[in-house]
From Swiss-Prot:
The gene is frr. Belongs to the RRF family. It is found in: Cytoplasm. It holds the Pfam family RRF. SUPFAM superfamilies: Ribosome recycling factor, RRF (SSF55194). This is Ribosome-recycling factor. PANTHER family: MITOCHONDRIAL RIBOSOME RECYCLING FACTOR PSEUDO 1, RIBOSOME RECYCLING FACTOR. Its main location: cytoplasm. The keyword Transport does not apply. GO terms for cellular component: cytoplasm. The keyword Cytoplasm applies. Responsible for the release of ribosomes from messenger RNA at the termination of protein biosynthesis. May increase the efficiency of translation by recycling ribosomes from one round of translation to another.
Amino acid sequence: MGIMCSGDVSERMNKTIELLKEQFLSIHSGRVNSGQFEKVMVDCEGASVPLVSLASIRVLNANTIVVTPYDSALLSQIDRALRNVPNIGTPGNDGECIKIVMPQLTEARRHEYVKQARVKAEEARVSARNIRRKARASLDAMGLAKDEIVRREKELDKLTKDVISVVDDLLRHKESELLRL
């Protein structure tokens, strides 16, 4: 049956939305978010280990996050990894935990982040359209009756429109979050 299993197409469209949500979490909006640190990898004895498996990450207030290692011997490696994360404040190591005070965003920086969000949203839209295009191509290759092809293409178009609508809603929400002072 190929790519045209409606569940497969729907699943791929949902993955596009989930990826966009993850990407939006990594765009700093003026408030700290523990999601910004989920992808941070720590060099630990020659292996890259996710920060979330080595330390607790706690939001202290709107601008401060506290990273407390489960093993205090890993404090310096975690500190080093956090210093390599772009767009966060300088980590402050007090010997037990690491506090990161996120800098306030300037108006220019907020607009730069809005542009990044728009680029990510457009990439998600393009991805949804590419999934639709591939599904249509597999429909044509299936040799179905013309009316069945038309019916499935309408379903594809509706699914694609719905996904793009969700992408647009996520973008609007992220833009308002970024531009709110």
